[in-house]
């Protein structure tokens, strides 16, 4: 607020000096009124939100398809990191959090198509995707529907209090899928 008032005072002084042809006035920083509300610090950007999902190739090239799926999950993780950092912050950057939430929703909406037949462990290509994604598709789809619903709520949570209330259920729905449908790498 002080900066805005200072800039306005400086601009006015310069304009008056230019119009009057006299000596330029020296801008003076205004002093806050005694009863003025305390200045709330602006939120610090934790990190800019990464992008949303990349386009998937045709599933005829299984290795390329699985690589693109993995890259999408890596990018989803980066968006979740932005959300987690803002969740932990006393002054979350709601612009970055909202952008990341929009991306998470885009991932959740696209994710159901990332698991066509032949792109799982039976492909012979290393994957963190467990076979139960394909053998128990109804449970996978239910978990995905939960993530989609929670991500819609997270996108709608545009103030800090609503965001901090909604991030845990959204993150929990991600964790549920990790626990149920993801095989941790051997080197982790």
Describe the function of each predicted region.
Residues 12:
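Active-site-proximal loop/hinge segments that shape catalytic or ion-binding/gating pockets
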Residues 26-60:
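Post-signal peptide N-terminal segment of mature Sec-exported envelope proteins
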Residues 15-18:
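C-terminal motif of bacterial Sec signal peptides marking the signal peptidase cleavage site
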Residues 5, 23-35, 49, 66-94, ...:
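Sequence context surrounding c-type heme c attachment/ligation sites in exported
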Residues 1-8:
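Bacterial N-terminal signal peptides that target proteins for export
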């Amino acid at each position: 607020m002080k900066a805005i008032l200072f800039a306005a005072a400086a601009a006015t002084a310069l304009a008056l000096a230019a119009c009057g042809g006299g000596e330029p006035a020296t801008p003076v920083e205004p002093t806050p009124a005694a009863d003025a509300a305390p200045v709330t610090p602006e939120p610090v950007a934790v990190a800019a939100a990464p992008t949303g999902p990349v386009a998937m190739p045709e599933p005829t090239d299984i290795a390329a398809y699985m690589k693109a799926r993995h890259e999408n999950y890596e990018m989803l993780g980066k968006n979740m990191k932005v959300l987690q950092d803002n969740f932990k912050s006393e002054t979350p950057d709601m612009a970055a959090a909202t952008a990341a939430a929009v991306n998470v929703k885009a991932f959740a909406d696209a994710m159901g198509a990332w698991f066509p037949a032949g792109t799982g462990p039976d492909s012979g290509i290393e994957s963190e995707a467990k076979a139960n994604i394909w053998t128990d598709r109804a449970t996978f789809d239910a978990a995905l529907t939960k993530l989609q619903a929670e991500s819609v709520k997270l996108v709608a949570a545009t103030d800090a209090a609503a965001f901090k209330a909604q991030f845990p259920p959204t993150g929990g729905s991600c964790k549920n899928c990790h626990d149920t449908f993801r095989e941790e790498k051997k080197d982790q």
